[in-house]
Amino acid sequence: MSSTESPGRTSDKSPRQQVDRLLLGLRWQRLEEPLGFIKVLQWLFAIFAFGSCGSYSGETGALVLCNNEAKDVSSIIVLFGYPFRLYQVQYEMPLCDQDSTSKTMNLMGDFSAPAEFFVTLGIFSFFYTMAALVIYLRFHKLYTENKRFPLVDFCVTVSFTFFWLVAAAAWGKGLTDVKGATRPSSLTAAMSVCHGEEAVCSAGATPSMGLANLSVLFGFINFFLWAGNCWFVFKETPWHGQGQDQGQGPSQESAAEQGAVEKQ
């Protein structure tokens, strides 16, 4: 009985042993260093950035009161959200004529380019920082011994810094345009029924932009995190060591000459 059960037990233990070895190989103390700690912040705020922008949805609206008694107050509610292709969002404009009831209208504007670029950059930042954390925690010796890894990490960090600045600024401008296009006043201004004397239009639901405003804030926080991390990544590159060697070279030579003079 013992001989038949031993293979099953060893097969059950082998995956656990592999997981234990993997966890034991992780050097969690690296997270206390700036290089690892900032990567954790970059990973978290990348989630906050693309999550707050990509999950946003809001609504705007207006009220139309026809002067004719045959018509009641019409409430218009328009739902919109990411990726903010507002020209594809439809709503029904009531008509105060006796013959017709409503007319299909569309919001104006397409702000998908800055929004999608912002979300895409956040997703790429999420995956890159997660991969970088694995290298820092599990393969840090390879990272320090191989000079290519710090150089690649530095170049990628500088690139992400630039892209986050562009993405946050572009999405901030795009969000301002989205607010202008989805205001209730913009909705009533686009409806022809509100320009005549046969109806009275007033503002309805006002869109709440709190989550969208946070996404812009998270974008600039990501920029500052990546910009600050450039220095710590640069310190791991051979370029930083060369600069120190060049700075210490003349001082060491002058110290040696001074020692020789004192001996004489």
Curated annotation (Swiss-Prot):
Q: Name one GO cellular component term.
A: synaptic vesicle
- Which part of the chain is the MARVEL domain? 30-238
- In this UniProt entry, which residues form the Cytoplasmic topological domain(s)? 1-33, 138-150, 235-264
Q: Where in the cell is it found?
A: Membrane
Keywords in alphabetical order: Glycoprotein, Membrane, Transmembrane, Transmembrane helix
Q: Where is this region: Disordered?
A: 242-264
Glycosylated residues are: N213
Intervals, Vesicular compartment: 55-116, 172-213
Q: What does this protein do?
A: Involved in communication between the T-tubular and junctional sarcoplasmic reticulum (SR) membranes.
State the similarity comment: Belongs to the synaptophysin/synaptobrevin family.
Q: Which protein is depicted?
A: Synaptophysin-like protein 2
Source organism (scientific name): Mus musculus
